[in-house]
From Swiss-Prot:
It is a multi-pass membrane protein. The gene is Tspo. This is Translocator protein. It comes from Rattus norvegicus (Rat). Interacts with TSPOAP1. Interacts with MOST-1. May interact with STAR. The chain crosses the membrane at residues 6-26, 47-67, 80-100, 106-126, 135-155. GO terms for biological process: adrenal gland development; behavioral response to pain; cellular hypotonic response; cellular response to lipopolysaccharide; cellular response to zinc ion; chloride transport; cholesterol homeostasis; contact inhibition.
Length: 169
């Protein structure tokens, strides 16, 4: 019996694994600290973040499956589009420990700018292989722009809080 669904499900779920690991930092003391910060009025309610990230992670994960399948697996030809994807995913997963764990809002902002750049490069690389896979990243790019602005305003408005006024430690 062929289990051709396994790569589709596996690659779709991979981004969420890092999201679950990052959730470790977004609880307890990290949440209390974040709740104490000044945030802009357009800050989304906390309950919306899990569904948003779940949807974005699933879309990017399925997009990676499309690229993987189109290029015949983890081939030399897949190195750039899947390598960029892996790089942006690692940078994405690094954000919660930087922001909530280390409370380094400035460095978290730098991380988000890097994620945005590498995610844009990923989208362009994917578009050459599969425009539908690239389109699955469009909502993610929009969310990254929003998240970057939110991170900036939180950093700016909380200067002097732990990690709020400095980029270097």
């Amino acid at each position: 019996m062929s289990q051709s669904w396994v790569p589709a499900v596996g690659l779709t779920l991979v981004p969420s694994l890092g999201g679950f690991m990052g959730a470790y930092f977004v609880r307890g003391e990290g949440l209390r600290w974040y709740a104490s910060l000044q945030k802009p009025s357009w800050h989304p309610p906390r309950w919306t973040l899990a569904p948003i990230w779940g949807t974005l992670y699933s879309a990017m994960g399925y997009g990676s499956y499309i690229i993987w399948k189109e290029l015949g697996g983890f081939t030399e030809e897949a190195m750039v589009p899947l390598g960029l994807y892996t790089g942006q995913l690692a940078l994405n997963w690094a954000w919660p420990p930087i922001f909530f764990g280390a409370r380094q809002m400035g460095w978290a902002l730098v991380d988000l700018m890097l994620v945005s750049g590498v995610a844009t490069a990923t989208t362009l690389a994917w578009h050459r292989v599969s425009p539908p896979a690239a389109r699955l990243l469009y909502p993610y790019l929009a969310w990254l722009a929003f998240a970057t602005m939110l991170n900036y305003y939180v950093w700016r408005d909380n200067s002097g809080r732990r990690g709020g006024s400095r980029l270097t430690e």
